[in-house]
From Swiss-Prot:
A GO BP entry: pyrimidine nucleotide metabolic process
Pfam families with a match to the protein in the record: Cytidylate_kin
GO cellular component, as recorded: cytoplasm
Binding site for ATP: G7, P8, A9, A10, S11, G12, K13, G14, T15
Entry keywords, A to Z: ATP-binding, Cytoplasm, Kinase, Nucleotide-binding, Transferase
Alphabetized Gene3D superfamilies for the sequence: P-loop containing nucleotide triphosphate hydrolases
Family: Belongs to the cytidylate kinase family. Type 1 subfamily.
Stored InterPro entries: Cytidylate_kin, Cytidylate_kinase_dom, P-loop_NTPase
Reaction equations catalysed: CMP + ATP = CDP + ADP; dCMP + ATP = dCDP + ADP
Ribonucleoprotein as UniProt keyword: no
This protein's name: Cytidylate kinase
Gene: cmk
CDD domains: CMPK
Predominant location category: cytoplasm
Length: 210
């Protein structure tokens, strides 16, 4: 059983994906970390984030251990990853990586921007998690504050809006709702309510897994 979860930044898809993976005993991949890791490799090498050849090389040599680097969670890496993820060669280089993960015996949970549309188009469970830009900005603002990264709410909202536009408008694998995905708007939902809504979808497609 592959559970494909897509959605914009700070929609709650990562929290939900981790909870579903834990509940159903499946491995989980936050595919956004792959793009953050590529961006970090470029920054460490003092290369331009728009250098497609260098970014592709970094993507093709990416090691799973690099996904544990604490720097990947920093706010600046989100913007850097958004730039790198717009490069077609990088998306192509990481596609096999993601598909191999999804092919794990028993299934997997993957979350990102193009899981249900490109990476796992045949996934039996596809969820698209969204929320209003303002609510997503509030969540990210609280998260950053909790990590000791104080930043103005207006700056966080502007970053969310900018990343939404870039994700939706890029030529390679733009963010969109898969035709057979179930949309869950978490604007007014807490994490538990979002989990219950998602689990109901999973169990309708995967009977007996409560």
């Amino acid at each position: 059983m592959v559970i494909a979860i897509d959605g914009p930044a700070a929609s709650g898809k990562g929290t939900l994906a981790r909870r579903l993976a834990q509940h159903y005993g499946l491995p989980h991949l936050d595919t956004g970390l792959l793009y953050r890791a590529v961006a970090l490799a470029l920054l460490d090498a003092e290369r331009d984030l728009r250098d497609e050849a260098a970014a592709e090389a970094a993507a093709r040599t990416l090691r799973a251990e690099s996904l544990g680097d604490a720097r990947l969670r920093e706010r600046a890496m989100g913007e850097a990853a958004s730039l790198v993820s717009a490069l077609p060669a990088v998306r192509a280089a990481l596609l096999d990586w993601q598909r191999r993960f999804a092919a794990a015996p028993g299934g997997a949970v993957l979350d990102g921007r193009d899981i249900g549309t490109v990476v796992c188009p045949d996934a039996p469970v596809k969820l698209f998690i969204t929320a209003s830009p303002e609510e997503r900005a509030h969540r990210r603002h609280r998260e950053l504050g909790g990590r000791g990264e104080p930043v103005a709410f207006e700056a966080v909202l502007a970053d969310i809006v900018r990343r939404d536009a870039r994700d939706a408008d890029r030529a390679a694998a733009p963010l969109r709702v898969a035709d057979d995905a179930v949309v869950i708007d978490t604007t007014a939902l807490d994490a538990e309510a979002a989990f219950r809504a998602a689990a109901a979808v999973v169990e309708a497609r995967w009977p007996g897994r409560g």
